[in-house]
């Protein structure tokens, strides 16, 4: 049923809205940065591995919440006054007409006219509203092919393509099925459209497009096909580049995609040639980038690339060993996962292959020996602790390392 024509729409004061969800806050809480969020929204943000304030991107010294009782009281007073003003009727706390979530019956009608930006936007609101809505659409066998046709059609406006990608990113249908649909006939038209969405879309559209690429990278064939598509790796290198406007969410999504496709040996060589290692070095050495997931995925991708000889040479030789410095810097500083990836990289460089002895000097100069001694006693896996022991056996024969053993770290000697 439609809304009554006399129904009143209320404009919500901006400071009553959560900066993340943009909805009226039900339980406002403030972080140590002073910014207030709805408790549920900020909890999801922090549970996702983030340790920064979403609004300011400042590193959080503590993740504790402080209930903003003053704001809660103001919201309650405002809400009560709105209710009294309208004699008990429930006001609509949303922008007028066209923003409400359509019903399932209305969606069934919308599916008959998908080549309309307005209709696609309504479906976006529908799938964003609940898990049951997403499941409802994902079970409609004809729905996904219709979205793929929108993306594939050359004359489709970019706005329609972006909305179709947004829906696909939300409903997460069967990977193999979607991959086969989008990459049929070498996937040319679909990949071209997704690249355009990455190039021309806003931040949200870029992230969604990258996630769809990641999702359809289903097997070795699809990973190679996507990686070899002109422009894909170029755009990914831009996405993980450190600039003033860099966004951690886009970097993380892009790294996840690169990790997925790097399982192919041919793709690893292409990533090395595209200077992915230089980009990773910049991420590791950027003090202001404190996102845990970004660091973990940067190190995981670097670990994968270190399996190739050209990758190891690039890591050791890049900017006089600065990449190795970045790896050592993250030991014990970010998370257990990050430490394990970092140790594996150093073990590969210094113990297994030892193609460049200068890397050992870089590890020692960066206080790597002391950190490795601590790793041995950490809660890292037994395999990683053994790698740390192997590394110390290699490094201990260097005279400068021996000096460290005899002075600062003798009390934690493993031998």
From Swiss-Prot:
Catalytic class of the enzyme: transferase
What does the UniProt keyword field contain? Repeat, Transferase, Ubl conjugation pathway
Extract one GO cellular component term from the record: plasmodesma
Q: Write the Enzyme Commission number(s) for this entry.
A: 2.3.2.27
Substrates-to-products reaction catalysed: S-ubiquitinyl-[E2 ubiquitin-conjugating enzyme]-L-cysteine + [acceptor protein]-L-lysine = [E2 ubiquitin-conjugating enzyme]-L-cysteine + N(6)-ubiquitinyl-[acceptor protein]-L-lysine
Q: Which organism is it from?
A: Arabidopsis thaliana (Mouse-ear cress)
Q: Per its UniProt record, what PROSITE patterns does this chain match?
A: U_BOX (PS51698)
Pathway(s) it belongs to: Protein modification; protein ubiquitination
What is this protein's record name? U-box domain-containing protein 29
